[in-house]
Amino acid sequence: MISPTHQSQYLNYFVNPVLMTESGDIIDSVTGTTTTTANMSNTTIDAPTPASTTKNYKHKKQNTNTGTSMSPSNSINSTNNNAAAAAATTTTSKKSKDIPLELTAFGTTPSGKPRLFVCQVCTRAFARLEHLRRHERSHTKEKPFSCGVCQRKFSRRDLLLRHAQKLHAGCTDAITRLRRKSIKKSQDGDDDDDDDDDDEEMANSEDENDHDESGNASTKNGKKDKKDPPPEFNLNLFNSKQKPTKANTTKSKVAKLSTTTSRKNSTNPTRKNSSSLHKQVLDQRQKAAVNTKIVSSTKIVSGTNSGVSITPTRSRRGASFSAQSGANYAINIPEFNDIYPQSDNVEFSTPQFLPSSLDNEMTWLNNIPNIPGLSDSVSAANLMRQNSITNSADHVTPPVNVSQHGSFSHQSTFSATDMGQTRSESVNSLNTPFDGSYMMPTVTISNQEIQNGVAAHHHHQQQQQHQQHNHQHQPNQSSLGLSRNDMLSEDHYGYSFYDIPENILNFPMDSISTTSNAMSSGPIQNFKPLSPITQEIEHEITPRIDGRIGDFQNNNNTNDNPIHQNINYDLNFLHTIDDIGQDVISKFMPGGYSFYGDNNVSATSSANDYNSPNNIVSPSQQNNQFALHNQSSHPSGASPHLNQAMMNKMRLHNYSSNKLFTNHIRHMINKALGKYPISGIMTPTIPSNEKLEFYLSVFIQSFLAHLPFIHPSKLNEYEIMAMTGNEDINNESARVCLPLLTATMGALLANNKNDAEHLYEASRRTIHIYLESRKTNSTNDKNYKNGKDKSSSGNPLWLLQSLMLSVLYGLFSDNENNVYIVIRQLNALNSLVKTSIKNKGPIFFSNNGEDEELYNKLNSHDNGTSLFSNNLNDEMRYKNNINMQSQTRIVFIIYRLTNFLLMMYNVPLTFSINDINQLAVTSKDEETLWNFKNYQEFQEFSHKNNKTLDDYLNHKNEPIIFRELLLTVIKFGISDSNISPEIEKKVTHQLQNLCKYGFNCLVHGIYEIKQYQEMKEVDTFKVLDYLTKFYPTNDGLGFNCFRLPANKDLEKIDYALLVDFTKISSIIDLKLLKEQSWLKNYQDLTQNYHRLLDAHSTGNPLNSINDYDYLKLADCCISVLKLILFKVEDSNSNSRNRSKNDPTNEINNKLNNNNNNNNDMNNNNSNGDQLISAFDTDFGYLNMDNNGYAKKEEFSRFTDDELRYDKENTMSYFDKHIKLDIFEEVEKSSNLIQAQMLFHAFSVLSIFSVYVMRKNDNNSSPFANTDLIFELNHRYSMVLRLLERLETFLKLRYQTSAGGGGGGVNNNNNNALSIKLEQEFTNLYLYNGNVLSSDHNTNTNTTNTITTTTTTDNGTKQNQHHSQDFGLEKTLYILKMGENVLNYIYDLNLKVCVFKKLGDSLSEIRKYLIDNESTLNG
């Protein structure tokens, strides 16, 4: 018997409910069609809904407590992960909602009101027309509310308000008027403008009004809600001793506040109660005047200096940003485990904050001008502001009655003291150094105002004390510290990113003590706080280039910084690049996404670690700051006019040219982090200077050696301060962005997870502050378009380098949504680069400071009459060449990064070769200059070898235009193209003079061109092998700027990997696997893998891959594995070590290096490591002629190569020219970029394994080519033996690490590694068995070569008998080993979660093969 409940569900699932509106029309709630009563007789009940729709219903989350139905978007989000099925049933699922009867036209509201307004789409009814109109937008997807900052559109104004609060901190430009309306609690913490729960929001919004009118309202399940009293506005909000109201007490004792509680407050009662505001203000001010005393201590949550205390009557709640419940979030100081930077914290420069109350706080501030006793005159306001600044200049903590958001705070901002105590609090009794983290970061105050206050403090101390004594009896003016006509209103709610300048941050200690004693000797004073954030009147502001608010006109200041003449900011860039931060939501707080793939709390965390390290100034820096302070402390009329550039030159002499992370840089990092405008979140911990220097060295050796776009000579304190010399002296964030990011990448490559995430968070914040200051500067500076130097762009080179590193770090996120966000960040960076290179000038990005002077000097007309000596002039030319190369290299590195995403994960290309235009690539001679650490090292080399700088700066050669060279080289791969000898000679000359990274860019360009359908016929193997002939060899210098040995050529290894991967992609299309492997859509991943198996099966007549292509695939995959996982050295450098200056030695090595691959495998290096051939394919078994062309001319024409070029010997031909020695030793890999090719290599090897298995099953055919089958089985054996060698190595490494020999691995990690060792490697024997175990301990020659010199029938039969063991278990073994290798890289080499994701993708493919074993074998 079916119960009534099940019967009702059955009808809801399989029968379209038919409802009637008040007009008499019948509406099908599933299809949305309307039938009039006249046609009612023709209406029939439709057939049951499809199974897919039924499945969607089963996944619905029914919300019976609130009496509302599930929104269409939620039903869609609850479906299965099959995108195709979900797309087919989206429309049906949206409309097929189970609307409760009480929510239709037949029901009433909880207060008894009839529902008169019916939705014509879903039959939902409402009691008010505006509720229906808002609900209808959930069907029409209309989004009329637009953000004024980032242009995002929203369907409801409350969503826009929440977006403005979360991402733009209530910025004025985001929304013209902030309406105080209740905002839905965010369930997931995102700022999506999706209408997932639009209907539920409407029901709650409607019902809460009914609850206010009726106290007997109940929910659907019969549970009654208590009637909340009408909200009252009172200034006791700012008194932490007040008794909690009933509304707060009711919900404070539960662990999580409900959404309804945060919405039951309405703004209308607040306005009604505003009449009593004046009385409350006067009462509080009188109370403050009577109860004036010093507060000795303040309760701080977990040691934080944010000045926010715990209010026990309020509990922690979710991330809702309702205007009525904003105070609940400003007091929401999380527990340590919540606020600590977890492993899912990778972000890019967007603030996250806890918004203060919009309703209570804003209403109070809006009524301040009406309070009796407050002056409205501008002059009085200016005087009060000046006095307030002067009196508070020596304080070392912020005023407790001003929130960290720059406006007056609510009750949670205060400690357990009353209003009067906080008003009279003085912190002069604390003789501690001023810490920048104590200052409220969003106070709007200019540098000149601070200087005037300091000057007044020194020269008018008697008058100052008198004014303070008078202000004690005038609490209405002094205690509030408000003096502007345009007090904060709804239309001018904003924030500022500027903190107290360093004049106050480094205030002399003796002045502080003196002032403190003077203050304590007199009467107790009321504290004069800094004024809260306001929007200044237009005539009060003067535009200044440093981005700070200008001085009042009535102030006589002659110490203004001169306006820079060479600034040409690109406003489009400012709006575009700042989206990099605005789109990302998660911060150094819970809820972010993980770059590391785990959720463990960092080991270096501390419950008291809520602030920056102490801003301890080094003695030299402290003296400098005292001198600067004394200079600025003179009366403003006596201050000299000093040119900013001249002052920068004077300071440069005090900076180190050998180290980057000095005490001075550390001090600026602390100050920059102290200016971060968001309160309530932890400040990252900066490692010691020694650690930072170590990370810098790792960055140079392991990162710049692969992607050389920053010259190491630029990574010291002197150069950093010089290249940022044009920035405002108080803008510390400009100086510390690039150093922090270099240390971040170094910590990542050093596998220090804690330091990497802390350093990245610090760099993210500093970039955000700098970008905001850039926008402010560009807006305020009216003359920035009148710069004299038109060659300089407004985008500094160091900023492009910093953004590139930041995007690269955050690119491989654990959350696919944030992956898309970071891709948009890269696209914004690409747009900036494309815009910058369109000017066709030599300078794409501005060179500041000395670099700019060098360029101008060397390119001036009177350069011939220079007074510089030749030696000094050569040094200038050398440095200028490094600067010009940096301009070009950053463009090509960003192009390579964008193209890499296309290669690895099929991300659409947004920076093409067509965008590069006529950009010339660096020549080999210029690259030689780049490889020297500095000019002194080049000078030493030139003296020994009788070389001059002109030999390397030979301008007679034509520039190598990258796009033209690429398109010409592609023609060599087209069979019917006729290339003239002149063109071929020109191309040969250019390739002979091309630098290494230029060859790597050419491979990326070839891959891009192959994506076009018209270029599918290009023979990629021919083109790439032709390029390899000209790949530059090391010059035998014996050293390089990357501090690597001469035989460690990482760029050449990258080139070989790119060539192998491009060849693989030209044979088999892996686009179906690439996207899903990154996004972890495992169902689509396995389906696409199945399509690949079917498309390339032996029985498919449409299979475009023949047996020879499969041999090439196997060879390329084996090469990829060896190049990434084994020790690789440059064989050409090894020969040069024996004879550096013998020019004939190079050709002899090229001729003899590959005469016999078997002989190469028997050679040993100095350490006794045995060489293995990375590219040995033993194609000689088929053609017996792989050595016949070895003595050809080295640089012969490509047409001559075609005579001896066939598809059997491509890998040996490539091996002949690349000259890489690969040893049997497995080496720790730090190749962050190219190591991701392992996923593709193992995936292709698994497809190759299935193909060989099926090929062997069909071997009984009389038409089978036994020779090819033998070669296929031979490659298969090579793959399995290589994996067995890796298995032995991984077991040893995991055992060593688990036993405590991993170097600093703690016990928890040891236990985890032991468990992993037991789980991951125990079942490998089941997959692999002992088929090849007898050969496991044989030498390398036997391991890699199982062929004989003769091809007898017995040998073939023996191989066929051996190949019968190559079943599905071997394919599973290949995938399992790929999973283990990727997990090993993640566990012990690079804590980058993309490797773990790729390993999981291989695991899913393996599980799919196990589940479909019968299909594959059949």
From Swiss-Prot:
SUPFAM superfamilies: beta-beta-alpha zinc fingers (SSF57667). Disruption phenotype: Affects filamentous growth. Transcription factor involved in the regulation of hyphal growth. The keyword Flavoprotein does not apply. Residues 236-278 have a biased composition (Polar residues). InterPro entries: VerF-like, Znf_C2H2_sf, Znf_C2H2_type. It is found in: Nucleus. This is Transcriptional regulator ADR1. Residues 189-211 have a biased composition (Acidic residues). A zinc finger (C2H2-type) spans 117-139, 145-168. It holds the Pfam family zf-C2H2. Residues 34-44, 68-93, 462-477, 1145-1167, 1338-1356 have a biased composition (Low complexity). GO terms for biological process: cellular response to starvation; ergosterol biosynthetic process; filamentous growth; filamentous growth of a population of unicellular organisms in response to biotic stimulus; filamentous growth of a population of unicellular organisms in response to starvation; regulation of transcription by RNA polymerase II. One of its GO terms (cellular component) is nucleus. GO terms for molecular function: DNA-binding transcription activator activity; DNA-binding transcription factor activity, RNA polymerase II-specific; RNA polymerase II cis-regulatory region sequence-specific DNA binding; zinc ion binding. Residues 34-96, 181-285, 403-426, 454-484, 1132-1167, 1338-1362 are annotated as: Disordered. It comes from Candida albicans (strain SC5314 / ATCC MYA-2876) (Yeast). Targets a different set of genes than S.cerevisiae ADR1. Induction: Expression is increased in biofilm. Keywords: Metal-binding, Nucleus, Repeat, Zinc, Zinc-finger. The keyword Glycoprotein does not apply.
